[in-house]
Amino acid sequence: PGDDLGARANGEEAPMRRRLRVGLIGTGPAAEALGTMEVHLGPKADQEVYTYENKEHWEGRVTYSLLSEEPLLSAVESLAIAAWRALGCRDGGRLDIRLDATGAPSFIEANPLAGLNPGHSDLPFICRFKGIPYDELIRRIVVSAIARAGLPLTATLSKRIAA
């Protein structure tokens, strides 16, 4: 898998087309994809890149959709999980994937400290599309960190985290 990941990482030779964001949770073998969202730049958006302006003032500029087409979804999420693990990312974050003109996915960047603003951050958007409430996203990140630290997750602590 490492050699395959390297061959597909940041392949900027071919023009990149579709913009995908993969939400991830967990650390190491426990890491999993929460879902994959596609970013669609509208006519009012900066077109070359997903700029700060596009992201922060997305209404009227950008639309988002949940990626569901197979086998693309499986390929994208497998690539994202492999990159997340290879980079040693932990607990929760986001990876950006682009598809080239042939439809091949390439890893572009990792955001292991992804924004968590429910009104304009990609990771909470992905969770909302997947039906995962915001408080559940935060709970999963905290539970991952507690498990990674080797601390016991008592029933009392679990209830406090969920509250």
PLM features: what roles do these ranges have?
Residues P1-A75, A104-S106:
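Phosphate-binding site of ATP-dependent enzymes
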